[in-house]
Amino acid sequence: MQIILSILEWIYLNVRYFLRKGKNKQESLDVIKHAEMKNINDEERFIFRRMAEGDMEAFRFFFEKYYVDLCNFVNIYLNDPATAEDIVQDVYVYFWNKKENIHIETSIKSYLLKASKNKSLNYLR
C-alpha cells in the first residue's frame, strides 16, 4: 500500500510540474490522463457514499482535495484563471446537486476532470 501511495504522490508531483512549467497542452493532458486511470479506492468510495447521503464535510473533502488541480486543468483550455475557477465551481455545484444519481467507475478525480473538461469545451463553443 505504501508503494502505491508513493507512486501516486510521484504522479501527482509530476502532473503539477508539467502544469507549472508550461509544457505543451497535449503533454500535460496525457500525464493527467495516465495519472487518473485508476479505479476508485476504498477511502474515496466511503467518503463519496457519505457525501451522497448529504454529508457536507465529505463534500468539503473532495472540494479541498481537487479544487486547485481542477482549476489548473481547466486553465489549460481557457487560459483565464478567473473563468477557470467559475467553471470548476459550477462543476462542484453540479456534483453536489446530482450526488445521489452519480455512479463513478474510475476515481472521483477522473470524474471531476472529465466534467471540468466538458464544461470548458462547452464554454469555448
Regions found by a protein language model. Give the residues of each.
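Arg/Lys-rich amphipathic alpha helix in sigma70-family domain 2
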Residues: E100-H103, K117-R125
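Short, charged helix-capping/linker segments at alpha-helix termini
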Residues: A52-F61, C71-D90
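N-terminal module of bacterial RNA polymerase sigma factors
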Residues: M1-V68
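Short alpha-helical functional segments enriched in proximate histidine and acidic residues
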Residues: F73, Y94, K119, Y123
